[in-house]
């Protein structure tokens, strides 16, 4: 997580590796400008890329940057149910390929429609597909949904380019997704991200290693649709 001087929080996933294969290109330090941290998202050092994504989210995911037609969901404990309500109203009749969701397979069992899940080998269960299967799966799906974790792991780029070739609907969904309207100009159809209402408390929970649903209680989701 990254907390700005004016009290805005940006979240990002944590990807653990057995050993660090790549050094830091941009060493993050307290007080560093966001514009200096953001290029680290391109790094193959997953820690560096994760911190950079959190910095990007701290820049975009704030109430004063939301477009007028953004859909704002209820916060607090109700944030935990936003994904289910969104899926029921937007995608229940579609087959979806979901890359590295922040939800476990069992949490999606009551979600309408068909969802195929892609994960890196380190995170995969026997019911998930290995990430390299996207070329076989995506042609038979109606849409591709990508999490922030896939931007850190570098899976998002190839998948989104392939989805564009196939003219599939593309969605970015998760508490680690930047609410950046200009992404719509790059072919993204829908974005749902998270805004922390109590940034200090969210930051404290992240440092403590709290579970996802505890953090969600102190913020709300926002959706942006391509017009």
Model-assigned labels for residue ranges:
Residues 113-125:
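NAD(P)-binding Rossmann-fold cofactor-contacting core
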């Amino acid at each position: 997580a990254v907390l700005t001087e004016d009290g805005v929080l940006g979240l990002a996933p944590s990807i653990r590796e057995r050993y660090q294969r790549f050094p830091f290109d941009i060493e993050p330090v307290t007080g560093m400008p966001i514009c200096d941290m953001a290029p680290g998202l391109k790094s193959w050092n997953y820690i560096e890329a994760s911190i950079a994504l959190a910095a990007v989210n701290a820049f975009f995911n704030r109430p004063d940057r939301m477009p007028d037609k953004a859909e704002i969901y209820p916060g607090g404990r109700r944030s935990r149910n936003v994904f289910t309500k969104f899926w029921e109203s937007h995608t229940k009749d579609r087959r979806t390929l979901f890359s590295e969701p922040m939800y476990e397979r069992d949490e999606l069992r009551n979600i309408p429609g068909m969802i195929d899940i892609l994960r890196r080998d380190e995170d995969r269960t026997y019911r998930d597909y290995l990430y390299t299967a996207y070329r076989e799966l995506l042609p038979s799906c109606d849409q591709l949904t990508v999490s922030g974790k896939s931007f850190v792991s570098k899976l998002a780029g190839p998948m989104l380019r392939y989805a564009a070739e196939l003219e599939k609907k593309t969605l970015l969904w998760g508490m680690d997704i930047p609410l950046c309207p200009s992404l719509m100009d790059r072919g993204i159809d829908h974005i749902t991200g998270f805004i922390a209402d109590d940034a200090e408390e969210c930051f404290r929970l992240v440092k403590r290693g709290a579970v996802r649903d505890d953090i969600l209680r102190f913020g709300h989701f926002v959706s942006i649709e391509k017009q």
